[in-house]
Amino acid sequence: MNNALDVKNLCKTYIVNKRQNNVLKNVNFTIREGEMVAVMGPSGSGKSTLLYTVSGMDSITAGDSMFYGKNIGELNVNALADLRLDDMGFIFQQMYMLKNLTVVDNIILPAYQSKKGDESRKKILRRGQDLMRKLGIIEISDNDINEVSGGQLQRACICRSMINNPKMIFADEPTGALNRTASDEVMSELIKINLEGTTIMLVTHDVKVAAKCSRVLYIVDGNIKGEYNLDNAGSDIRPIERERELNNWLMEMGW
């Protein structure tokens, strides 16, 4: 199995009030194709910074982030923008959508900017509607953004992240703003996407969410302190035991 993401000696430093803040310190890890990997750790440990940096949404201070063999840090601005648009999908805790567009128009917007192919609006719209149907939200296709629930909106964000058929999805607290029912529904959809072959890296503070992944990385003070291997992502085998075992391991890590 090939590596989707290969991170070596990654460092990220910010200068705040003329003082150096080393947020990531020689981080090393890999994510294989088809994996669904969670990143956990205390608040301020560098979880989100790690996700933003390895995906090229934030600059790398030192080290390498290899995305399917391409060095993120060596790409120019245009090449990096094209890579993120065509081969990466992004989901965030804050569900950003343009309020002057319908739900489906928000979902298909990235397809107009993609260089994967020159498609007609009809074909792009059909693909967006197919994704909405797949995720069970086709009924809100023509709704305004303020007319849908948080759970529906996050599923729409998943559709948008998939519109260009990305190789990998990066999700920062994708269930953080949702209640438990909506959270479970969103995770079920992400698991389905993963089982179809899309690699996923997600940041979460929720043990229940992380226990649905195939592997968990634990970061403390900008360093990967350990990793925990689970069964296949989304496995229904021993779900309660998976959560308990993961929670016990996190406690050992200092959670």
Please give the residue ranges for each predicted region:
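The feature captures the beta-strand-to-loop junction immediately N-terminal to the Walker
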Residues: 40-42
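Conserved catalytic motifs of ABC-family nucleotide-binding domains
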Residues: 165
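ABC ATPase C-loop
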Residues: 161-162
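Conserved ABC transporter NBD signature motif
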Residues: 63-71
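Short coil-to-helix segment of the ABC ATPase nucleotide-binding domain corresponding to the Q-loop/switch region
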Residues: 101-110
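Conserved ABC ATPase "signature" region
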Residues: 71, 120-139
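Conserved ABC ATPase signature
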Residues: 144-148, 152
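Catalytic Walker B motif of ABC-type/P-loop ATPase nucleotide-binding domains
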Residues: 169-172
